[in-house]
């Protein structure tokens, strides 16, 4: 579908209901999140960035590079406020904090979210099937993403986007191990946000989203709105907050862009041959699919059934379970594609399993509906 940026497009794409954000909006790498809708929390605001000379110099430079109105950019950034509670939310958990897939899973795969997923699927069945046909991305994956991200629009964030982005662009926590790179990332997102706002006539003070600046039902960052959002309902604008069709099409568009392979499983079961196992070598590439089936099995990872005929590379994915033994799967290129939406294997498995649970609940729900 054509990407259309009408005067109100970006404003519509960005505004969400004032509810608390979810896993992606909080921290892209943490095993956490809430599965139930909660009351909005209005973040405490600190000083306005108009008082920061370094920020105003950055605004001047950005306006020049982007060919934007200098006074407008200075005014917009100057009205953004530091959010004192946000920087700490970006810090990784303390060293030694155990990840726990079972706990993480329980936060996203529960009856409330599954019922919401069934209702979303039933209400948007034709659109989901159209997106799956056009982009060759399974309905289960689209449904899983939207459910994990915002419980199908119930938790889209309560932070003013310009405040969140400015805070992370200019006051990213220096103690973060990748502080420089992450700060540069958020400066780029702030640029995208302001560029879209000025060129579409939208008020940059209005949109709300997550504390990381993600927006709408699919929790797209501004750069993702630019690159992947589509007008899937054909009304001439992209609305990622209240148009399920645009949300569905945009999520499918995202996965197509990240090389989703039609018909390929996301992962396979795996067990180990203790006599040949070289787990360190198998885990060294992390979740990047690297090994052929032959190399995978030669290093002691045992596959069965259809997995033995898999043609692409595989990765050994480890999901820690606290003090209990870890779980393992053989991740494919499609598993890796899900981690491009959120760089976490735990997130990817939650998306996959939520989609499956919703799909499994659909027949019974359809029977009851009759």
Regions inferred by a protein language model and the residue ranges of each:
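Bacterial N-terminal signal peptides that target proteins for export
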Residues: 1-8
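Bacterial N-terminal signal peptides
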Residues: 8-16
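An acidic, Gly/Ser/Thr/Pro-rich helix-cap/linker signature
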Residues: 24-123, 129-132
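Surface-exposed patches in mature extracellular/periplasmic domains of secreted proteins
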Residues: 68-77, 138-144, 204-209, 235-238, ...
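Acidic helix-start/capping segments at beta-turn-to-alpha-helix junctions
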Residues: 69-97, 146-150, 159-167, 269-277
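Acidic/His-rich structured neighborhood in mature extracellular/periplasmic domains
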Residues: 98-250, 256
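Ligand-binding pocket segment of bilobal, Venus flytrap-like solute-binding proteins
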Residues: 237-292
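C-terminal soluble interaction/assembly domains
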Residues: 273-370
């Amino acid at each position: 579908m054509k990407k259309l940026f009408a005067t109100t497009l970006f404003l519509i794409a960005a505004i969400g209901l004032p509810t608390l954000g979810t896993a992606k909006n909080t921290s892209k790498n943490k095993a956490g999140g809430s599965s139930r809708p909660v009351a909005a929390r209005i973040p405490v605001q600190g000083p306005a960035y108009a008082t920061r000379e370094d920020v105003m110099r950055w605004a001047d430079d950005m306006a020049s590079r982007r060919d934007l109105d200098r006074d407008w950019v200075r005014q917009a950034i100057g009205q953004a406020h530091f959010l004192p509670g946000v920087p700490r939310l970006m810090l990784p958990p303390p060293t030694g904090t155990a990840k726990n897939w079972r706990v993480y899973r329980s936060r996203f795969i529960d009856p409330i979210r599954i019922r919401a997923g069934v209702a979303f699927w039933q209400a948007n069945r034709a659109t989901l099937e159209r997106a799956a046909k056009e982009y060759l991305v399974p309905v289960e994956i689209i449904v899983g993403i939207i459910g994990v991200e915002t419980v199908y629009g119930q938790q889209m964030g309560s932070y003013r986007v310009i405040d969140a982005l400015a805070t992370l662009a200019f006051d990213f926590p220096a103690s973060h191990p990748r502080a420089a790179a992450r700060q540069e990332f958020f400066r780029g997102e702030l640029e995208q946000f302001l560029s879209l706002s000025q060129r579409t006539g939208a008020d940059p003070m209005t949109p709300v989203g997550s504390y990381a600046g993600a927006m709408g039902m699919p929790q797209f960052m501004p750069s993702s709105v630019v690159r992947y959002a589509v007008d899937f309902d054909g009304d001439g604008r992209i609305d990622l907050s209240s148009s399920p069709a645009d949300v569905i099409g945009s999520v499918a568009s995202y996965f197509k862009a990240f090389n989703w392979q039609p018909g390929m499983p996301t992962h396979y079961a795996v067990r180990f041959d203790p006599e040949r196992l070289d787990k360190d070598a198998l885990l060294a590439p992390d979740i990047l699919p690297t090994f052929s089936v032959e190399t995978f099995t030669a290093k002691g990872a045992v596959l069965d059934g259809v997995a033995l005929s898999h043609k692409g590379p595989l990765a050994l994915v480890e999901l820690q379970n606290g003090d209990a033994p870890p779980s393992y799967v053989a991740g494919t290129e499609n598993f890796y594609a899900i981690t491009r939406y959120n760089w976490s294997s735990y997130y990817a498995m939650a998306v996959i399993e939520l989609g499956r649970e919703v799909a499994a609940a659909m027949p019974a729900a359809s029977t009851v509906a009759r």
